[in-house]
Amino acid sequence: MKRIFILIVKSYQFLISPLLGNNCRFYPSCSHYMIQAIERYGIFKGMYLGLKRLSKCHPWHEGGMDPVPSSCHCKDEKNRKDQAEKEKEKEKN
């Protein structure tokens, strides 16, 4: 079942993405992120993470480096966000 969802995303990468151009504001791209998340966490958690990432893909989000989390728990995600904010503050100073 995982293979089917990954095949759908890879089809998008091959058929549709070249027509839209390289517009992703994140690294890895949203489609690569979705594939990695599905491979790591399975269909449901992977799709959740991928769709959550897609919801951030808009002009008002700064983008940047956003790898698939090493664990998929709300507490870990909050800690990751806090760490990212601390790093941004260090860069400003």
Swiss-Prot record:
Coiled-coil annotated residue ranges, if any: none
Membrane protein topology class: Peripheral membrane protein
Keywords for this protein: Cell inner membrane, Cell membrane, Membrane
Protein's cellular compartments: Cell inner membrane
Domain of life according to the entry: Bacteria
Main location: membrane
Region of interest called Disordered, as start-end residue ranges on this chain: 66-93
Keyword Repressor: no
Cellular-component GO terms for this entry: plasma membrane
Ranges of compositional bias, category Basic and acidic residues: 73-93
SMART domains: Haemolytic
A Pfam family: YidD
Family indicated by similarity: Belongs to the UPF0161 family.
Function: Could be involved in insertion of integral membrane proteins into the membrane.
Alphabetical list of NCBIfam families matching this protein: membrane protein insertion efficiency factor YidD
Name of the protein in question: Putative membrane protein insertion efficiency factor
Species in which this protein is naturally found: Marinomonas sp. (strain MWYL1)
